[in-house]
Curated annotation (Swiss-Prot):
Pathway where it operates: Amino-acid biosynthesis; L-lysine biosynthesis via DAP pathway; (S)-tetrahydrodipicolinate from L-aspartate: step 4/4
EC number from the UniProt entry: 1.17.1.8
Keyword Oxidoreductase recorded: yes
GO cellular component: cytosol
InterPro entries: DapB_C, DapB_N, DapB_N_CS, DHDPR_bac, NAD(P)-bd_dom_sf
Stated role: Catalyzes the conversion of 4-hydroxy-tetrahydrodipicolinate (HTPA) to tetrahydrodipicolinate.
Protein name: 4-hydroxy-tetrahydrodipicolinate reductase
Active site positions: H156 (proton donor/acceptor), K160 (proton donor)
Pfam family, one: DapB_C
Primary gene name: dapB
GO biological process terms, semicolon-separated: diaminopimelate biosynthetic process; lysine biosynthetic process via diaminopimelate
Protein location: Cytoplasm
One Gene Ontology molecular-function label: NAD binding
Positions with a binding annotation for NAD(+): G9, A10, G11, G12, R13, M14, E35, G99, T100, T101, A123, S124, N125, Y126
Amino acid sequence: MTLKIGVVGAGGRMGRQLIQAVNNTEGVELGSAFERKGSSLVGADAGELAGIGHLGVTVTDDLASQLNHFDLLIDFTRPEGTLEHIAFCVAHNKKMVIGTTGFDDAGKQAIKSASEEISIVFASNYSVGVNLVFKLLEKAAKVMGDYYDIEVIEAHHRHKVDAPSGTALSMGEHIAKTLGRDLKTHGVFAREGITGERKRDEIGFATIRAGDVVGEHSVWFADEGERIEIAHKASSRMTFANGAVRAAKWLQTKQNGLFDMTDVLDLNNL
C-alpha cells in the first residue's frame, strides 16, 4: 500500500527537498503540501515549487481540508507551528516525522505525550551519517571521555534561528549519557572574558553562523600531545530529506510510540 505523505513548510529550503525526496522514493507519494496562512505560495503546484515539474498537488494552508490526502506528516518547521500540527495529528490519528529543532522541555514533553496516541519519529538530524557519528561518539567517550577535553563545534547558514544546533546538542547528550553526566550542568555554551582554567568534565560548545553552510559538526577529544576529531559535513539538504522519507516508510507499520533514527536504522545492535 502506498504511503501518502504531507509536507509542512513546502516552500522552504527543506520543504522543497522533501518534496523531491518523496517523489524519488518508491512506495510513497506526495499527498499534500502545506504553507503558513498568508503565504504567497498557497495555490502553487508543489512539484513546480520544488523544481521537478507539475505534480497536481496544490499547496494549501488548511490541514483539515486534506484529511483524506495524507497518512503521515513530515514537519521541519518551527516549534510553535509543529506543536499545533502535533495536536491536529493526534486528533485525526496521523503519523508524524518531526525534524523541527529548538523545542524547550515543555515542547519535548508534548511530543512524548502525543506519542502515546500516534506514532512519531523525532530526531535532531535525519542524516544516516550523522546517526552513525552518534554511535562513534559513544564509543570514543567510553574510552577517552574521562581523560580528554571534549568540545563540540558546529556551523550552519546565516538563516538558522537556534543555537547550538539540535544535532550539536544531541552529540553532547550522547557523550554525556555515556559518561554518566548531565549535559545541563556539564555543558558550557559560551566563553568570554576571564573564564578561568577549563574543567576536565566540561563539554564545550562553539557555534558558527555564516553564509550558506548546510551543516558541519566536529567533536574534539583533546589531550596533551594528541587530538582526535570525529566530524560530519553535509553538502546538501537532500541527505536529511532522504533520511526523513526513510523514517516515514519505517514508521508506516507502527501504531503509536516515540522513535528516533537509532530505531529506524537499527543502530542499537551495532
